[in-house]
Amino acid sequence: CIAPRAEGDLFERICESWAHVPSPEREIGIARDVIVIHMGSQANLFAAMAWTLIFLLARPDVIERIRAGDDGILNPFSHEAIRMTQRSIVLRRVVAPIDFEQGNAIHHLLPGTLVSTMMSVTNTTAAPWLAKFDISNYRGSVFPRSRELAAPELVTTYGHGKHTCPAHRFSTSAITQAISELVRHFDLEPRYKDPHPRPRQLGGVARADRLCKIAYSRR
C-alpha cells in the first residue's frame, strides 16, 4: 500500500523546490535529490548524529536544558558539531582567470576549470576562533559570524546556495528527535577518551579515529 502524503513533508518541499523547472528536468532533479537524501541517511547522518552526541556528553549543562524541554538548542549544537567534523569535498567552477600560488609554483586557472575544495581545510582555520567548539557560533541553523570571514563559504556544514544539501532539514530534525529522546530516557556515560576525526578521510562527515563506547542506564 502507499502511505498517505503528509502536507509539508520533506518530499513535498523537494517537489516545491523544483516547481519552476520544466519537465523532464524537474522530475530528474526531484529523483536525484531523493537519492542524495537516501544515501546521506545511510552514512553521513549517523556520523553527524554521533559527533553531536560526543560533543553533547562533554556539556552536562546542555543535556539538562534538553531534559527540561529545550530541544531547539540541538539545532545550533548539531551544526557546530558538523562544522568541526566536516570532511566533504566540493567542486568549484572558476568563473574568471586566477593565479593560484602553491609553494614555489603558480597555477594559472582559466574559466571553466573545476577545483576541488575540502571543507575541513577552512572550517576550523579560517579564523582563530573557529578552532574550538562553540555553540554560540550558530543561531539555529544560521552562521551569523560569516561576515567576520573573508568569504561566507569558508565555513560550511550543509553547503551554500544551490549547493545546499537537500537533506538539511530532514537531518536536523532526525538528529534533534533522536538525541533528545536518548538523553531524556537514559543516563549516558562516555567510555572513550578524546576522539578526533580520522585524519585521512576524504568526503562526508568524519568517522572517529577510535571506538567510542557509551554506557547507558534507564533514567
Model features per residue range: what roles?
Residues F170-G204:
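Cytochrome P450 heme-binding "Cys pocket" and the immediately downstream C-terminal segment
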Residues I14-A68, I175:
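Central I-helix of cytochrome P450 enzymes
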Residues T117-S146:
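Conserved cytochrome P450 K-helix/beta-meander segment immediately N-terminal to the heme-binding cysteine loop
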Residues C1-H20, S171-A174, R219:
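Cytochrome P450 heme-thiolate monooxygenase catalytic domain
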Residues A68-H107, P111, S116-T117:
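Conserved cytochrome P450 K-helix E-x-x-R motif and the immediately C-terminal K′/meander segment
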Residues D70-D71, I98, W129-G140, P195-H196:
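Active/binding-pocket-proximal capping segment
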Residues H20-E27, P144-T156:
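Active-site-adjacent bridging/hinge elements
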Residues A81, G112, G161, A167, ...:
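Hydrophobic, well-ordered secondary-structure elements that form the walls
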